[in-house]
Amino acid sequence: MEAYKNEPFVPEYDQSIKGIVTEIFKEQSAATVKRLREAFLKLLVNGIPPEFIFMGMLKEIIKKPKSEKFQMCVINECSFFENRSQNGQKAIMHLEAFIAKIMCLLVDKNLN
């Protein structure tokens, strides 16, 4: 029992968000976006607000070793899509658009 006292508790939704970001960096394709839609739906159905998902993804993406220019673009896109998600009705669409944009930024050679 002593071994578990020092381990921090990580909520399941944080683990899901880390998995989503890992997938984004592993493969940039339409098939990945389609696969990740299921993960987003699971988070949303379980009551995780889109704002938490956006901020969780942003924190995980910024941890990755990329250029400062890339990180600034990610922050800009996250704020743009989070704002659209708050003003719109279907959060899933804005989450998908955000990860598609991040995939485009990852492929862009000028930002890496």
Where are these regions (language model features)?
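AAA+ P-loop NTPase domains with strong preference for DNA replication initiators
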Residues: M1-N112
